[in-house]
Amino acid sequence: MAGHRKLGLPTDQRRAMLRNLVTSLLKHGKIETTETRAKETRSIAEKMITLGKRGDLHARRQVLSYVQEELVVKNLFDNVAPKYTERNGGYTRIIKKGPRRGDGAEIVILELV
């Protein structure tokens, strides 16, 4: 049964962390994080961009319920989503950076294509 990754966090903390990562990705265009967090974030971010492509009021409200900053939502609907009108999915890429010095966790850069 496919589901989501637990990421070693309780549910509320995991949801909060993923909301922050998605907001940062849409705000800055790229983020640096661990590989498993990036894979989980990518899934959610792609859904947000697909909602942005729809462009109606309901989609905007759905994104607003997840993304924390209104300016990021406005930017998503006005600038980011129109770039991907011809593309069906695959809005992000993961670039491996190497292991983290402290614990050896695989660090990657997650960026919008």
From Swiss-Prot:
Pfam families, A to Z: Ribosomal_L17 (PF01196)
Family assignment from sequence similarity: Belongs to the bacterial ribosomal protein bL17 family.
Domain of life of the native organism: Bacteria
Species of provenance: Clostridium beijerinckii (strain ATCC 51743 / NCIMB 8052) (Clostridium acetobutylicum)
Protein name: Large ribosomal subunit protein bL17
Sorted UniProt keywords: Ribonucleoprotein, Ribosomal protein
Biological process, per Gene Ontology: translation
Record's subunit section: Part of the 50S ribosomal subunit. Contacts protein L32.
Keyword Cell wall biogenesis/degradation: no
InterPro entries named in the record: Ribosomal_bL17, Ribosomal_bL17_CS, Ribosomal_bL17_sf
Recorded GO MF terms: structural constituent of ribosome
Gene Ontology cellular component terms for the protein in this record: cytosolic large ribosomal subunit
